[in-house]
Amino acid sequence: MMDDKHGRYGACDRCRGQKLRCVGAGKPIPNSSSRLLRNEIPCDRCRRAKVECYSVRPAPRRAASNVKEQMIATQAASERSSSLAYHTSGPVVSPPNSLVTAASKPHPNSLSFNHPRSDAVAAPGGLQTRRQSRDTDSLGDMPSMPHEWMAYLHDHKMDDRQGLGMETPPLIESDLNLSRDPAMDSMHEHNMMMELIHQDHQEEWNSGPPELEAYPDPIVPPNPAPLKARKLTSPDCDDYPYGHTRRSSHTPTQPPEPAGRSCIQELAQFNEMLLRDKCSLEDTSARRGYKDSWLSIGRTLHHCQQFFSILKRIKYSRPDSQLSADRARSQWSSLPEGTSLADGAPTDSPQARRSLARGATPCSSSLARSSSTSSAASTSYLGLSTLLSILFCYTYILQAYEDILTSILHAVTRPTPTIPPTLSGLRIDGFQLDGHHTLQLECLLHVSYNLLEKIENILFGSAGPEELSNPVKYGILGDKLSAGLIDALFEHNETNGLLHCQGKREVAAKRLIREIQAALKQLDL
């Protein structure tokens, strides 16, 4: 320990913060409680290191011009501290003796740290007790300076967080908590608890009816459907009667995509492709001045086959396919033999066939009732866009076939008939069909007729029952009577061409195929 004449009554804060022994200046400090005097006379260690020697907080970078400015700053700080203590109703600062005694108590959670605010220096033996008693006597003899003590406490808090440039040890935090008001702390905790309670209450969903004041527009009434949907789809709980709730699983379960939806998407893509082909063919025909029909035979066959595969998947993926068949079987089994249509003719009479050919809709008969019921049931699951896509694709394919078959029929029935090549490059198990134009045309007609017949059966169902034991199989667009929607596009001016095979309605493409086949039999080429 240093001598009294060459030492200080208390170590400077820089040396005390670094756990170093503070070497005093040449002459002792007459009043160690004065911050200005301790900053005025640095210790030997700080002077050799050429750093500012401070006790409470670092001295300003520029040297003070006079002591009067520093006293004014100290007085202003003391006034702010006194006003703060008055407004917060804090307790009066205890005398220096009690402050030193309270500061000398070790923290219960501390193991090896001494209190940083005590003036005692760690030394062997009983030197620390003698140093503390000497400091206590000197502090008790000095005059009372309340404003400087308030400034000291205020600067003490600022120095712990800024001056030392290090984290505040738990001992200093306990020293700062000595002057707190427990009533204010309890009030602060009470306010925080009330804020948490009010916050939880605001996040809670209001299950009552929505208020009109919450909606700025008085004309549009509030829709409680989104609120109800939010309540029902809450990930926390599900609604149960009697106020019980069940915790739902947070793992999202996505329903598998039905097969019918993928088929409908494929149909939409096929529809877009046909639209592009139609636009390109129209542009090509406008530039060349004629319709390039024969060059589109293979493309038309490909479109027809693809459309048939899509319709077949849609048919077997619909939910009421088996139900419609059972309903149709029960309806046809209940019909007595010789049931009349709207005009009073039996179903197997020529008059009934002519009424079907004219597109009559016998709504008063049980046959029409069963047809309309099955048509509504079968098309209920198809949307409007899907229905229009099916009609457009079918109409486009029929129009392409009509263009191709009409040009072939004109070539076959002219005064000097010729059979054009239709399926060039076709091979049947190594047998080349090139040069055999008649075989090519017969293959084209046979394949096209079968594809069109299958598409027609899927769309409108099979033909009417020849016997009561065979029930009607309805298509995805209804029964065979609905074929008039398509036939009207191609058979405006022809009335005799609609009658074929017990009054069945047929499209113009199938009629052209039959006429070409009849012309080939007459030519014998």
From Swiss-Prot:
Residues 12-53 bind DNA. One of its GO terms (cellular component) is nucleus. The keyword DNA damage does not apply. Its main location: nucleus. It is found in: Nucleus. Induction: Expression is induced by the cAMP-dependent protein kinase A signaling pathway. Disruption phenotype: Leads to reduced growth and sporulation, but does not affect virulence in infected mice. Impairs the production of isoquinolines. Residues 95-115, 327-337 have a biased composition (Polar residues). Keywords: DNA-binding, Metal-binding, Nucleus, Transcription, Transcription regulation, Zinc. Residues 80-142, 204-260, 327-371 are annotated as: Disordered. Transcription factor that regulates the expression of the gene cluster that mediates the biosynthesis of the isoquinoline alkaloids fumisoquin A, fumisoquin B and fumisoquin C; as well as small amounts of fumipyrrole as a shunt metabolite. The products of the cluster lead to a brown coloration and are important for growth and conidiation. This is C6 finger transcription factor fsqA.
